[in-house]
Amino acid sequence: MTASSKPSASASDSSADGTSAHDKILIVDFGSQVTQLIARRVREEGVYSEIVPFQKAEAAFLAMKPKAVILSGGPASVLDRAAPAAPMAIFTAGVPVLGICYGEQTMAQQLGGTVEAGHHREFGRAAIEVIDACALFDGVWEKGGTYDVWMSHGDRVTKLPDGFRAVAKAPGSPIAVIADDARRFYAMQFHPEVVHTPDGAKLIRNFVRKVAGLTGDWTMRAFREEAVEKIRTQVGKGRVICGLSGGVDSSVAAILIHEAIGDQLTCVFVDHGMLRKDEGKTVVDLFRHHYNIPLIHVDASKKFLSELAGVTDPEAKRKTIGRLFIDVFEAEAKKIGGADFLAQGTLYPDVIESVSFTGGPSVTIKSHHNVGGLPDRMNMKLVEPLRELFKDEVRALGRELGLPEIFVGRHPFPGPGLAIRCPGEITNEKLDILREADAVYIDEIRKAGLYDNIWQAFAVLLPVKTVGVMGDSRTYDYVVGLRAVTSTDGMTADFYPFDAQFLGSTSTRIINEVKGVNRVVYDVTSKPPGTIEWE
């Protein structure tokens, strides 16, 4: 995606999106690695939230007119000469403000308090003691109680601004939570948004519901209705092309757009030959026969595999597949003719602006692996109906639209497909073996009732052969690696702790049913240090 087609995450766009009628909370990002979790926690309460970098916070605040503001954590120190700060307009507008970690420190300093470099740095789990009641703690924490939280800070507040009181303390933070009830300003040194703070979501709920007084009217049903109207307004009588992969994002986007404009939408499904077992047929049946969406199915497997012959480097595989996909998609789109818009399954994390402390915001936008660059090449405008949603919200929207659970709840699948689950050179033989082994593995997981407990599970065909004995004969066949992880966002992951009986029975079934495999291993690597995919 080129600069001219980069979507903006600025809150100033809110009046044009499907959220203008709803209460909103503005999240000012100071560079924390977990700022997105704040937005997700707020949205779990049915309140729409947007993230903006601190450099654009004042303009966003004035344009968005939020009902409350949250100041995120960040890596900087308020003691630095060029330390980022919140716009003072936020503190004079009469709206509730919640500061988290760095957000607490900048709030305290900007309002007249004192922050000092900590003599006792706190990173990781810590115990916090409640020394006074406040609205944030209502029904969650009691005075005198001690509770687990997650800390990550060096500086600390040592003198309160006028109007504030300390309501909790920790060993490294004598002033760990502060409250100004009259102005509805609250701040905490720990991170309530992470799962390592067990009661964190409840504290954020109290800020949203009890402090800000928001009722939560932002639902997937409301989003669906507003998105349909927005698509109709944007597209008018124009035609839309959507690159369909069969994944959750493109599937939900296609169904939502079709609901809005019907047969003005045409989907193009490119089968590059590296899909899972029966995946192509499943996608075609669902969209062409069940939803009656105009669909062009292109079997380009021979073209892709021919170009990939001899390619072993994983990055070279990705680039080759991406280049070929664009070529094939563009050729099919031109055959359709007359299309004005290109639909993408862009999600909110793809358009959030990252924060730079070295000269203004740097925008990190991940274009869809399939259609990046096509809007400009084909002179089309973008339709991105999911650009306000997180992944879990897309799944919820899919259920609202009636998409079968087998699609809505399916595990993430990489754009290059099985190519990066087959280290080394790709051949038809290897892909066939991998498809069958993967199908058996997933079937066993589903039969055990474990599929929904796992973030992602898949088989890998290792580029080695080992000696085995089957019957009375010596074998020399491939090794299959099994991978399954738990995660909340894919950024970090732990391997799933299957019991030995499950692994044993799954291994036996793969070896018995998949010709060309005589050994199965299980990957017990977490992320980090490993990645979820092998390539």
Curated annotation (Swiss-Prot):
Active site: 101, 191, 193
Signal peptide start-end: none
Organism field: Nitrobacter winogradskyi (strain ATCC 25391 / DSM 10237 / CIP 104748 / NCIMB 11846 / Nb-255)
Annotated ranges, domain Glutamine amidotransferase type-1: 24-217
Keyword S-adenosyl-L-methionine among UniProt keywords: no
Single GO term (MF): ATP binding
GO cellular component terms, A-Z: cytosol
UniProt catalytic activity: XMP + L-glutamine + ATP + H2O = GMP + L-glutamate + AMP + diphosphate + 2 H(+)
Function: Catalyzes the synthesis of GMP from XMP.
EC numbers on record: 6.3.5.2
Sorted UniProt keywords: ATP-binding, Glutamine amidotransferase, GMP biosynthesis, Ligase, Nucleotide-binding, Purine biosynthesis
Positions of ATP binding: 245-251
Domain GMPS ATP-PPase, first and last residues per copy: 218-410
Pathway: Purine metabolism; GMP biosynthesis; GMP from XMP (L-Gln route): step 1/1
Quaternary structure and interacting proteins, as annotated: Homodimer.
Coiled-coil ranges per UniProt: none
Protein name: GMP synthase [glutamine-hydrolyzing]
Gene (UniProt): guaA
Record CDD domains: GATase1_GMP_Synthase, GMP_synthase_C
Cited SUPFAM superfamilies: Adenine nucleotide alpha hydrolases-like, Class I glutamine amidotransferase-like, GMP synthetase C-terminal dimerisation domain
